[in-house]
């Protein structure tokens, strides 16, 4: 099985909250697609609550689009990581980590302005697979933590696992 890009970086050395360019690729027509690792918590140290990350998923995608989309950038998708330490964001374009961090902070400020569960988009059984699993309070706590900590940048060259370690860790 091929090794996925996200598993070639040392999760024990990641900062959080932090932005990392996880992957960049070109479409056949020449457009740039960039995948960002938006790490909210330190891997293997903390996880986002299931209700908080789910509510954030509903709010964050829209708020990030409001702050980052433009003539050079269009967000394709923002999805929570299975490990519940952050989100992956795929987009057309190549914004800088600083632009993404600024949009992320602005989106967290927007989360704090949501006044009630009724203002959470698509929170109903027709548009959400687990409509009962939400907590605006927990989403706001996550947002407050990000704002208080600030957002740094994780760089692949600083986090790369050595080839010898990748071979040692390989599943046989």
From Swiss-Prot:
Its EC number is 4.4.1.21. Binds 1 Fe cation per subunit. It is an enzyme of class 4 (lyase). PANTHER family: S-RIBOSYLHOMOCYSTEINE LYASE. Involved in the synthesis of autoinducer 2 (AI-2) which is secreted by bacteria and is used to communicate both the cell density and the metabolic potential of the environment. The regulation of gene expression in response to changes in cell density is called quorum sensing. Catalyzes the transformation of S-ribosylhomocysteine (RHC) to homocysteine (HC) and 4,5-dihydroxy-2,3-pentadione (DPD). It catalyses: S-(5-deoxy-D-ribos-5-yl)-L-homocysteine = (S)-4,5-dihydroxypentane-2,3-dione + L-homocysteine. Keywords: Autoinducer synthesis, Iron, Lyase, Metal-binding, Quorum sensing. It comes from Vibrio cholerae serotype O1 (strain ATCC 39315 / El Tor Inaba N16961). Fe cation binds at residues 54, 58, 128. One of its GO terms (molecular function) is S-ribosylhomocysteine lyase activity. Pfam families: LuxS. Belongs to the LuxS family. Its cofactor is Fe cation. GO terms for cellular component: cytosol. This is S-ribosylhomocysteine lyase. Homodimer. GO terms for biological process: L-methionine salvage from S-adenosylmethionine; quorum sensing.
């Amino acid at each position: 099985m091929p090794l996925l890009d996200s598993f070639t970086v040392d999760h024990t050395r990641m900062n959080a909250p932090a932005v990392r360019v996880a992957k960049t690729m070109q479409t056949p027509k020449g457009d740039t697609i960039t995948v960002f690792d938006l790490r909210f918590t330190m891997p293997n140290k903390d996880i986002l609550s299931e209700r908080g990350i789910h509510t954030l998923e509903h709010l964050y995608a829209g708020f990030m689009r409001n702050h980052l989309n433009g003539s050079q950038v269009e967000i394709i998708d923002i999805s929570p990581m299975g490990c519940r330490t952050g989100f992956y964001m795929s987009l057309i374009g190549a914004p800088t980590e600083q632009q993404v961090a600024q949009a992320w902070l602005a989106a967290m400020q927007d989360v704090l302005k949501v006044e009630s569960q009724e203002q959470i988009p698509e929170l109903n059984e027709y548009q959400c697979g687990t409509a009962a699993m939400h907590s605006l309070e927990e989403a706001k706590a996550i947002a407050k933590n990000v704002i208080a900590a600030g957002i740094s940048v994780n760089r692949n060259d600083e986090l790369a696992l050595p080839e010898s370690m990748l071979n040692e860790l390989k599943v046989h």
